Amino acid sequence: MKMKKYTKTHEWVSIEDKVATVGITNHAQEQLGDVVYVDLPEVGREVKKGEVVASIESVKAAADVYAPLSGKIVEVNEKLDTEPELINKDPEGEGWLFKMEISDEGELEDLLDEQAYQEFCAQE
């Protein structure tokens, strides 16, 4: 079963089996503006929840991307090397950043559902 969750640091997480696909939310890309460069994590890297795993540079700012869960990076979106603008065009689809194998499914409970995330954004 596939489920989509969000973090307070503006990452989205689509979970299927024990693999999570991660990207930044539409709200985050709107704040950043036009993305010009993405620094992605290495495949095989073990990451802990909350650790900086990637960074995104735009014409306005640079932003860190945090691991929403603990686990191992199993794939990165190599299209972003030549087409970083995919993050602006389709942040929650073609503009995904990386996939990770989840090591602690208990951490899923800390993630927000879509309604809770929208409410969080409205309060910022």
Swiss-Prot record:
One of the GO biological process terms: glycine decarboxylation via glycine cleavage system
Cofactor notes: Binds 1 lipoyl cofactor covalently.
Positions where N6-lipoyllysine occurs in the chain: K60
GO cellular component annotations of the record: cytosol; glycine cleavage complex
Domain of life of the source: Bacteria
Lipoyl-binding domain boundaries: 19-101
Keywords: Lipoyl
InterPro entries in alphabetical order: 2-oxoA_DH_lipoyl-BS (IPR003016), Biotin_lipoyl (IPR000089), GCV_H (IPR002930), GCV_H/Fam206 (IPR033753), GCV_H_sub (IPR017453), Single_hybrid_motif (IPR011053)
Keyword presence, GTP-binding: no
Gene3D superfamilies in the record: 2.40.50.100
SUPFAM superfamilies: Single hybrid motif
Cofactor entry: (R)-lipoate
Subunit structure: The glycine cleavage system is composed of four proteins: P, T, L and H.
Function according to Swiss-Prot or TrEMBL: The glycine cleavage system catalyzes the degradation of glycine. The H protein shuttles the methylamine group of glycine from the P protein to the T protein.
HAMAP family to which the protein is assigned, alphabetical: GcvH
Family of this protein: Belongs to the GcvH family.
NCBIfam families on file: gcvH (TIGR00527), PRK01202.1 (NF002270)
Annotated protein name in UniProt: Glycine cleavage system H protein
Species annotation: Thermotoga maritima (strain ATCC 43589 / DSM 3109 / JCM 10099 / NBRC 100826 / MSB8)
Lineage of origin: Bacteria, Thermotogati, Thermotogota, Thermotogae, Thermotogales
